[in-house]
Amino acid sequence: MCITVISIISLAGIIVMLQRHISRRKIKERFCLVSSGRPVGKSCLIMTMQSCGPIIDKALECLSSNDNIEVCKNHRTGSQTIDIISDKVRDCSADTEGKIGKTSLYCEYMLEATDKIAETTRHLVTSPDSYIPISYKCEIETIRGGIVRLSRLADGILGVDDDIIKIAGDTGLEKDFIEHSIAVHSKGMTHEDFDEGAPAYSYLMLLYYLHSFVSFFSQALRNIETNNKLKTA
């Protein structure tokens, strides 16, 4: 009986390991970086945005629907994706001395912010006193829609300067909305709400990480614009 139980547990462990290996392989194949005709900085930014966008989208969806199973799954699989993409960003952009380019550095920051977003939403949804007011949900759905839109526009980074300027403008609007949300939320918080682990504080930190993500994307776009101008000067 004991041998049978041990065998079942061992088999289950092997299956889990195989599933993780297959999952990581699929992620690597999906984001196998960019053909040799594309500029490296733009390619890294597109890959980063298109990998982070779905993770953030799912995290905010789980927060709105209070889905504690999917939010944990998203954090786990999202962390795997982020690790792989982070390695690819460094591999594709490092020079002979191993230094990473400025645009790719912003991509690293975007990946870190995405991991924090997935982690914070998991904490908010799974905490014992996880109550998300309707006002928060409306706010989150608005931010979610904005980030999904930016993720879909990411391919435009490879286009002409006018496309990049348009994306930068949309990014600025998203950034302004999150800044406004942070100001309103922090103004309405009590002294106790600022205790670490309090739902209101965790929500404030989520807004901060979302703002960081959009800000780093904006800075990466500006860096690409600057590089384009230098090349055409």
Residue ranges of model-derived segments:
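Cytosolic, long alpha-helical scaffolding segments
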Residues: 1-4, 8-233
